[in-house]
């Protein structure tokens, strides 16, 4: 094979492949790229793999996380050294990393022709030392939302930053939503309307706001239920639901390897996060034509739910966006008392209005699928492949 026709070699780097948004993106990226490129995934640990990696080349560096500042520092250099050796052995053209620890290790490697790093959370870009490190040592820094890329360019003056939306397997989601064998859907099999939210037990998800807003929705519309799908015990949230008098209307469903049959049977998606990068769950809801009410947090909801994201982001009141309803951002202080805050009332009012307005509800249902296509894996692949080709001419 002539050199001009040689398949380029791509190394994807992720800390692990367990439950997590960027790990899922890493695996999906590998499957998309392997059609045109030789792809290898390097991970620091192969423990607790949650994704299908059959048919993919995965190398376990066996350098999992360690406790203590000294051990963590040593780990950074051990990982970078091992990755550099591997890049040289495999003659890697482009290394592309996901997550903070992988980005740091990748930035410090010297074995690939080009280096790409990816930021997937708003909290990540607030770390100035980290951002300076990866920007100075990367050929391109991807941010998963336009708002994040905008902030990085403005706050740090970096010019090698590009927005690259997370890929969503639209057809796969729709197909999986029809595979309900073995799933317990009894909570959904009533005449009640089911409101749903997804996310692990983490303060950044703002689930106390969700429960209090739902209490108000249920007061107005007693035929409503709430399901929270995600990993965690949710002990303090179950206690809050008891104090709010809604425990019999709320299901903490736990982690679901296939959450899509549950989304498919739901009536409304709610998001109450304090911050996001680009919330994949909103795109997944759109893919299943599920109407959305989301707080207008940094970042992601505004640009998912409205064409002119800058216009939507600037709104300080309830806003009926192109593809869903945005409500004011919630307060970051964790308040586990039963008193209601203004933003919770606004979220509850918007959700109640949408559920009670068949014309508005149907308009969002019809618009959802076309918007989800903008976040398809095909769109992601085209943009990523274009970047790789540009950098490796």
Features from the language model and the residues they span:
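A conserved mid-protein helix/loop that constitutes part of the nucleotide-sugar donor-binding site
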Residues: 23-28, 193, 197-216, 235
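N-terminal strand-loop element at the rim of the active site
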Residues: 12-20, 24-74
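Aromatic "clamp/platform" in nucleotide-sugar-dependent glycosyltransferases that forms part
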Residues: 255, 274
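A conserved, positively charged/aromatic
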Residues: 87, 110, 114-146
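A short, well-ordered alpha-helix in the C-terminal region of glycosyltransferases
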Residues: 353, 360-374
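Short hydrophobic beta-strand element within catalytic cores of glycosyltransferases
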Residues: 291-295, 300, 304-306, 310-318
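Carbohydrate-associated surface elements
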Residues: 147, 167
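Short His-centered aromatic/hydrophobic patch
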Residues: 79, 96-103, 119
């Amino acid at each position: 094979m002539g050199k001009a026709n040689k398949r380029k070699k791509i190394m994807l780097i992720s800390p692990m492949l367990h439950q997590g948004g960027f790990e899922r993106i890493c695996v999906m990226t590998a499957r998309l790229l392997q059609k045109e490129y030789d792809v290898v995934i390097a991970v620091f640990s192969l423990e607790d793999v949650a994704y299908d990696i059959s048919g993919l080349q995965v190398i376990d560096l066996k350098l999992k996380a360690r406790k203590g500042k000294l051990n963590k520092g040593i780990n950074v250099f051990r990982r970078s050294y091992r990755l550099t050796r591997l890049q040289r052995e495999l003659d890697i053209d482009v290394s592309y990393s996901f997550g903070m620890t992988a980005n740091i290790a990748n930035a410090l490697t010297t074995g690939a022709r080009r280096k790409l790093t990816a930021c997937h959370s708003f909290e990540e870009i607030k770390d100035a030392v980290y951002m300076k490190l990866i920007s100075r040592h990367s050929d391109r820094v991807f941010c998963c939302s336009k708002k994040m890329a905008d902030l990085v360019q403005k706050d740090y003056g970096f010019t090698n930053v590009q927005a690259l939306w997370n890929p969503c397997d639209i057809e796969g989601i729709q197909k999986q939503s029809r595979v309900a064998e073995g799933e317990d859907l009894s909570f959904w099999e009533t005449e009640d309307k089911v409101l749903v939210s997804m996310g692990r037990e983490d303060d950044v998800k703002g689930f106390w706001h969700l429960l209090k807003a739902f209490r108000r929705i249920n007061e107005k519309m007693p035929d409503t239920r709430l399901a929270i799908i995600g990993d965690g015990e949710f002990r303090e949230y179950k206690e809050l639901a008891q104090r709010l008098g809604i425990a019999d209307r709320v299901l903490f469903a736990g982690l679901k390897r296939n959450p899509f049959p549950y989304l498919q049977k739901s009536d409304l998606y709610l998001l109450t996060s304090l911050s996001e990068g680009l919330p994949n769950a909103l795109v997944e809801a759109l893919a299943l034509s599920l109407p959305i009410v989301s707080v207008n947090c940094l970042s992601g909801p505004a640009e998912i739910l409205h064409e002119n994201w800058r216009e939507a982001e600037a709104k300080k009141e309830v806003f009926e966006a192109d593809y869903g309803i945005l409500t004011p951002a919630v307060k970051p202080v964790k308040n586990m008392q039963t008193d209601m805050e203004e933003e919770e009332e606004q979220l509850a009012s918007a959700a109640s209005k949408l559920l009670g307005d068949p014309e508005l509800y149907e308009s969002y249902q019809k618009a959802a699928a076309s918007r989800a296509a903008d976040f398809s894996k095909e769109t992601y692949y085209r943009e990523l492949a274009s970047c790789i080709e540009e950098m490796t001419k």
